[in-house]
Amino acid sequence: MGDYVVVLEAPIIVRDVETSEDAINVAVSKVAKALNKEKLDFVRVEIGYSQCPVCGAHFESAFVIGSVGLVGMYLTIKVYNAQTIEHAERIAKAVIGKALKKVPLKVYEIRELTEEEEGEGVEFEE
């Protein structure tokens, strides 16, 4: 049994926004509200970053077209007592997916939990 940090990518669509800052604020609020409703306040929510194909600079993954925004977000959760990395991935997707219905979740990163990172998370019990 292992302990893992799982980072998932999630595209969040928001409506009635004018700027990318508005889109980010609404998306963070929308995700936080959904997670808190399921008592998942220990999930860390961060804005995703994209890389410019020309210059290589990083920028926030928030795009607005016609008052509709698309915001890329990273959701980080700690999973305890998972049998394998794949098991940790399934647990993370199930837990976060329950709160964010109809939002596709893709694994961005999975790594073993270090002693400094231990804290609140999801524990799997057989």
UniProtKB/Swiss-Prot annotation:
Pfam families assigned: DUF555
Family statement drawn from the similarity comment of this UniProt entry: Belongs to the UPF0212 family.
NCBIfam families per UniProt: PRK03922.1
Protein name per the record: UPF0212 protein TON_0350
Species of the source: Thermococcus onnurineus (strain NA1)
